[in-house]
């Protein structure tokens, strides 16, 4: 984990080495693969420099940690709702790259020990913190100031997203005496316009997706090659989870949303697939 250090300069150095490797290996296949440029955000100046460098190389997206500084965190620590980060958001908007937040970043996901530790760590210390940067973006006025930003939660599932959207709106409306700044729309609307989330197998999430009309915000992934992913049985996993969806819904979730989010040319992808099939 390149972000597993309280030293943001060291973290950025690791990110830079990884980014060089990722572009060297996958850059030649730019039209069909999208390595994400990893960026440490604890030091804003070095983060901006790395984002600009990777954008010039040709990366299609960014991977940021769920919290700028590694560790348990306090209210005094730098966090994404702090106006100091406006320079970072301005840079990301200028290079026009989507940003993603992956599970198990920003804090140690091994916070629990003893009975049930593996489950507790996975649910509480790995998956749950992924909501934090999304709430920061949707509720603090960032997206009013930088309406070109796009963001996604990666590998944390989708069943919790409708709950999060409702919770943000409830706090904004019912606690309005204490809420600042006042936003141009409800927090949930920012997610619908700017946000996305990926999942592997999440039947409750798919059910809620249909109820709340979030087909345009969710992206399926197989998490290759991790053991919690669906590969090499992805076809069966898709049918288990999405067998009841319509073809237009499946088209969005299984590819169209991701192509739009990361800026792929679908015609080029289809042409490559046709050529590969013909050679097989």
Residue spans of the language-model regions?
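Active-site gating/metal-coordination segments in enzymes
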Residues: 1-133, 140
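Short, surface-exposed connector motifs at secondary-structure boundaries
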Residues: 30-35, 60, 122, 147, ...
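Aromatic-anchored helix/helix-loop segment that forms the rim or "lid"
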Residues: 125-133, 176-207
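Aromatic-lined glycan-binding groove of carbohydrate-active enzymes
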Residues: 99, 103-107, 138-192
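Mid-to-C-terminal alpha-helical segments outside catalytic/metal-binding sites
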Residues: 20-28, 49-53, 57, 140-141, ...
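Short, well-ordered secondary-structure micro-motifs
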Residues: 111-112, 163-165, 208-209
